[in-house]
Curated annotation (Swiss-Prot):
GO terms for molecular function: rRNA binding; structural constituent of ribosome. PROSITE patterns: RIBOSOMAL_S11 (PS00054). One of its GO terms (cellular component) is ribosome. One of its GO terms (biological process) is translation. Transmembrane segments: none annotated. Part of the 30S ribosomal subunit. Interacts with proteins S7 and S18. Binds to IF-3. This is Small ribosomal subunit protein uS11. Belongs to the universal ribosomal protein uS11 family. Keywords: Ribonucleoprotein, Ribosomal protein, RNA-binding, rRNA-binding. The gene is rpsK. PANTHER family: 40S RIBOSOMAL PROTEIN S14/30S RIBOSOMAL PROTEIN S11. InterPro entries: Ribosomal_uS11 (IPR001971), Ribosomal_uS11_bac-type (IPR019981), Ribosomal_uS11_CS (IPR018102), Ribosomal_uS11_sf (IPR036967). The keyword Ribonucleoprotein applies.
Length: 129
């Protein structure tokens, strides 16, 4: 069934000067979401969205490209200063942060919000390579 040709909703420019960059760096991918102070998403990107597939998604370069993309989208909405919240053990943590600085944002604070279990579930078996 074909979609009806309706009005395409244009993205309105939000005039937000400061935001929060949530960098989620897992072992398999790196996701960057830039939100306002209340947590409403302004822009987002990930290594997979940028065309990296498989093991290339977990590289620092993929995280850098994704952070650059999310940063440029947020800059269009007027964001100039960022607080950065980094979560996860992935390799894209530092490179994503450097890419956000390269876009031209003023980074006011960097917080590590990686969840640490108080001895939660049993970890998966040890890898043997």
């Amino acid at each position: 069934m074909a979609r009806e040709p309706g009005r395409v909703r244009r993205r309105e420019r939000k005039n937000i000067t400061s935001g929060v960059a949530h960098v989620n760096a897992s072992f398999n991918n790196t996701m960057i979401t830039i939100t306002d102070a209340q947590g409403n998403a302004i822009s987002w990107s990930s290594a997979g969205m940028m065309g990296f597939k498989g093991s290339r998604k977990s590289t620092p370069y993929a995280a850098q490209v994704a952070a650059d993309d999310a940063g440029r989208k947020a800059a269009e909405h007027g964001v100039r200063t960022l607080e950065v919240e980094v979560k996860g053990p992935g390799s894209g943590r530092e490179s994503a942060l450097r890419a956000l600085q390269a876009v031209g944002f003023t980074i006011t604070s960097i917080r590590d919000v990686t969840p640490i279990p108080h001895n939660g579930v049993r970890p998966s078996k040890r890898r043997r390579v």
